[in-house]
Every structure is written in structure tokens, then in C-alpha cells.
């Protein structure tokens, strides 16, 4: 079989090492130049490669598509017009694991926000119960890296991965929440929502369980399963003090992150999912209470001169940033917005900040978008993060919280949200 890796990011890079051990003919195609290191590697292993998606892609039997490649791209057009079979690294790896290990249980986590935290927390709980657990997917570790002999596979799944996968079906699908996002990639909001729904529908049709945020159920086309006991919903109504109540079970949460509104749904989804996997309340409690937030997800970086610095660089959309800032209502906080907007309505975020923030500092591409809305005197505009920190040194007082939850993609000034987060941390140390 002629297999073409379309795009050569982390996931396809990892998959290539496995494919080289197969009898397939492997090509690599992407729309930009390869690094010299990549080219040396390809030549050493007799792998044909091309830029600008031409003959190699057109003549393959199977295209393994990097998730970020949009459906209106040149590569997608070639795939669709030539009726080339397609898949993703995630789906291809899942199929291979299932062939070798039919008892493997897959938990797929999707949603607009909280995917990475929920994936990490479910994985953290399951590792307490069973060390033979893999945690990865869109969160950063490709499934191709996993051994085929594990019991649990906890994978974050993006809407892009769902779009390019035809059959990937976890035993349990988890939907953290839904809000407008990636409208520069998907056709429209309904297309984005129904792409997310596909993962849940596949699980339900195969006899599996869908764990769904109660607020999102009506936004999805799940009518045929609405009354099904296999749709399990969770909501903040399940919280009583520092307890989560689910059916006849109670989980006591003493982790400080439970005090922040933004993490509550992630913890609820994780507790409900693992309870339905038969994990004991005691293990779930121990795991939740020892869990630490992911890097750049409303992470407390430092308390310095009476000021707390929170890094939420991973907040690349309005919904995520809104929920982060909402967690600081009633406290003195300074908000920092930046990045490239995603065709979203900023109104709820702007109104939240106008009402509750002490000051709002905006830099980067976000400035043009923010200035389209009615603002008040709290909004200040700077050219870069260094200028932001100079201004912070003038206005910060004891008891303030500096919250960097940008609400936009990082690509205006940074390679990714991690690089943006690292820059913020560096400036906190220097300040």
C-alpha cells in the first residue's frame, strides 16, 4: 500500500518511525519546506517527500492527515477530488492497538475548553488505579508512541482529528463543554458542534457511554439517544460544598483548584467518568486531591511583593478566557489580553472585564478587535509583553492578581501558546 503522511508535525513524525517497520511504501507531503534534518532522515530511509502537495499525494492509496490541515486547503482538495482514502495518526494507531489488544479501553475527551485538564486528570486517576494507562492524543503525546499492551488509553481529541477520522470510536466519549471556537477552520458554528457530536454518536452507536456537560446536550444532534442511560450528564448542581455527589456516591475534594470556577467542570467530568469505569471513591479522592494543573492553564506562577501572577496562556478563545476571569470575581485583578481573535463575539468577555477587572491591558493583534467594542477607561493598549510588565510595575498593589488569559491564538508574536507562556513566566521572574 502507498501511504502518504500529509503534514509532518509531531503526530505524523512519531507515526513514521512505526510505519518504517511495515511493508508499506511511505511518502511525506506538506505545503512548506522541510528542515535539513528531515531531508537527511528521509534520504537515509529512502522516503520520498514533496512540498506543495503534488504527485506523491495524488498517487497514494491512503492519506494520513495532520489534524490542523483545513478542509478548504490544497491538500484536502486533492484528497477529496481523487477519492483518496484518509485517516489520522490517532485513528490509525487506535486501529492497530485494537487489533493487538481487543480488551483495551479507550476514553476520548473532546470539547471547547478543559480538554487537556480533563484528559490529564482522568489519566491521573486511572494511573492511581492501574499503572498500565496511556495519556496523550491532542494533548501532546501521539497515540503512535503508546504500547499496544496497556489497559486504558486516555486521549484528548480535537474537532480537527474528529473531522479527519472516519471510525475512531472510544468506549467512553467525554464532552467537557461547547462554545464558539475554530470558526476560521470550520464552515460555521453548527459544523463545529456537529463535528464534536460525531465522536459521541460513534461511541453511543457502538454501545459505549457518553459523558456530557448538561449545558451542551441540547446543542448536539443526540435526539435518538436522549433518553438513553448511556448518556450521562454532569453539572455544577452536583457540587455540595467541597463534595461531588453522583448517584449514591460522594467524592470529597480538598484540592485548592476546586475553589476556581474554571476547574470545576473538569473535575466533575473526570469524577463521573472514572466512577463509571468502576474506580473506587477512595482512589478518585486521592488522585484528585494530588492533581496539579497543567502548565499555562491558570497556573499560579509566583506570589511576589503581595501580587499573584497567573499564567493562562492556553486560553486561546473567548469562552476559555471568560471563564478564567470569572473565577476572579470579587478579587482585585488585572487582565491581559493578546493574540489573534478567532472570529468570535468578544461582548461577554469585554462586559465581564469592564465590570470586574481593576485594569485590562491589551497587546498584539487583539488590539484591533477589542477597539471595535464600547470600552471604558480600564482598557490600556501596549505594543508587547515587555511594555505590559513596565505598566504593571506602576499600577500593581498588594493583594492584586495579574491574570494572563489572552483569548486569542498566539501566532501574531509567538510560535505557540507554550512559547507565549514561557515569555510571561520569564518576565514575572525579572519583574
Curated annotation (Swiss-Prot):
Catalytic activity reads: UDP-N-acetyl-alpha-D-muramoyl-L-alanine + D-glutamate + ATP = UDP-N-acetyl-alpha-D-muramoyl-L-alanyl-D-glutamate + ADP + phosphate + H(+)
Pfam families, sorted? Mur_ligase_C (PF02875), Mur_ligase_M (PF08245), MurD_N (PF21377)
Task: Quote the cellular component terms of the Gene Ontology held in the record.
Answer: cytoplasm
Q: Which InterPro entries match?
A: Mur-like_cat_sf, Mur_ligase_C, Mur_ligase_C_dom_sf, Mur_ligase_cen, MurD
Q: Which UniProt keywords apply?
A: ATP-binding, Cell cycle, Cell division, Cell shape, Cell wall biogenesis/degradation, Cytoplasm, Ligase, Nucleotide-binding, Peptidoglycan synthesis
What pathway, per the record? Cell wall biogenesis; peptidoglycan biosynthesis
Sorted alphabetically, the Gene Ontology BP terms of this entry are: cell division; cell wall organization; peptidoglycan biosynthetic process; regulation of cell shape
Subcellular location(s) per record:
Cytoplasm
Q: What is its main location?
A: cytoplasm
UniProt-annotated binding residues for ATP: 111-117
- Main enzyme class: ligase
Q: Which Gene3D superfamilies match?
A: Mur ligase, C-terminal domain (3.90.190.20), Mur-like, catalytic domain (3.40.1190.10), NAD(P)-binding Rossmann-like Domain (3.40.50.720)
User: Which E.C. number(s) belong to this protein?
Assistant: 6.3.2.9
Write one Gene Ontology MF term: UDP-N-acetylmuramoylalanine-D-glutamate ligase activity
What family, per the record? Answer: Belongs to the MurCDEF family.
The role this protein plays is: Cell wall formation. Catalyzes the addition of glutamate to the nucleotide precursor UDP-N-acetylmuramoyl-L-alanine (UMA).
From the Swiss-Prot or TrEMBL record, give the protein name.
UDP-N-acetylmuramoylalanine--D-glutamate ligase
Q: Which organism is it from?
A: Petrotoga mobilis (strain DSM 10674 / SJ95)
Organism lineage string: Bacteria, Thermotogati, Thermotogota, Thermotogae, Petrotogales
Amino acid at each position: 500500500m502507498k501511504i502518504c503522511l500529509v503534514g509532518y508535525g509531531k503526530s505524523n513524525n512519531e507515526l513514521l518511525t512505526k510505519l518504517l517497520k511495515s511493508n508499506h511504501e511511505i511518502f511525506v507531503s506538506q505545503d512548506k519546506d522541510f528542515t535539513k534534518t528531515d531531508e537527511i532522515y528521509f534520504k537515509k530511509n529512502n522516503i520520498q517527500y514533496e512540498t506543495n502537495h503534488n504527485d506523491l499525494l495524488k498517487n497514494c492509496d491512503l492519506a494520513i492527515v495532520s489534524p490542523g490541515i483545513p478542509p478548504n486547503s490544497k491538500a484536502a482538495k486533492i484528497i477529496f477530488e481523487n477519492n483518496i482514502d484518509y485517516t489520522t495518526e490517532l485513528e490509525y494507531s487506535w486501529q492497530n492497538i485494537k487489533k493487538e489488544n481487543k480488551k483495551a479501553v479507550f476514553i476520548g475527551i473532546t470539547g471547547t475548553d478543559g480538554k487537556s485538564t480533563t484528559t490529564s486528570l482522568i489519566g491521573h486517576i486511572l494511573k492511581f488505579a492501574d499503572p498500565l494507562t496511556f495519556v496523550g492524543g491532542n494533548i501532546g503525546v501521539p497515540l503512535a508512541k503508546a504500547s499496544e499492551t496497556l489497559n486504558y488509553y486516555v486521549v484528548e481529541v480535537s474537532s480537527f482529528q474528529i473531522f479527519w477520522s472516519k471510525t475512531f470510536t472510544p468506549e467512553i466519549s467525554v464532552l467537557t463543554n461547547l462554545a464558539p471556537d475554530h470558526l476560521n477552520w470550520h464552515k460555521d458554528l453548527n459544523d463545529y458542534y456537529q463535528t464534536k457530536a460525531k465522536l459521541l454518536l460513534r461511541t453511543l452507536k457502538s454501545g459505549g457511554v457518553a459523558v456530557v456537560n448538561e449545558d451542551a446536550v441540547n446543542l448536539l444532534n443526540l435526539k435518538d439517544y436522549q433518553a438513553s442511560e448511556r448518556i450521562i450528564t454532569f453539572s455544577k448542581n452536583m457540587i455540595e460544598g467541597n463534595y461531588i455527589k453522583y448517584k449514591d456516591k460522594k467524592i470529597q475534594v480538598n484540592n485548592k483548584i476546586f475553589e476556581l470556577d474554571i476547574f470545576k467542570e473538569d473535575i466533575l467530568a473526570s469524577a463521573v467518568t472514572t466512577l463509571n469505569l468502576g474506580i473506587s471513591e477512595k482512589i478518585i479522592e486521592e488522585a484528585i486531591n494530588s492533581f496539579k494543573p497543567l502548565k499555562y492553564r491558570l497556573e499560579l506562577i509566583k506570589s511576589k511583593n503581595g501580587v499573584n501572577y497567573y499564567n493562562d496562556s492556553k486560553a486561546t478563545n473567548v469562552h476559555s478566557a471568560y471563564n478564567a476571569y470569572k473565577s476572579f470575581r470579587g478579587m482585585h485583578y488585572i487582565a491581559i489580553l493578546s493574540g489573534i481573535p478567532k472570529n468570535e463575539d468578544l461582548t461577554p468577555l469585554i462586559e465581564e472585564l469592564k465590570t470586574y477587572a481593576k485594569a485590562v491591558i491589551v497587546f498584539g493583534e487583539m488590539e484591533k478587535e477589542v477597539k471595535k467594542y464600547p470600552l471604558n477607561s480600564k482598557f490600556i493598549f501596549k505594543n508587547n509583553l515587555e511594555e505590559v510588565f513596565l505598566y504593571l510595575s506602576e499600577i500593581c498593589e498588594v493583594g492584586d492578581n495579574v491574570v494572563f488569559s489572552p483569548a486569542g491564538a498566539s501566532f501574531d508574536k509567538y510560535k505557540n501558546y507554550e512559547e507565549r507562556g514561557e515569555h510571561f513566566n520569564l518576565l514575572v521572574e525579572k519583574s
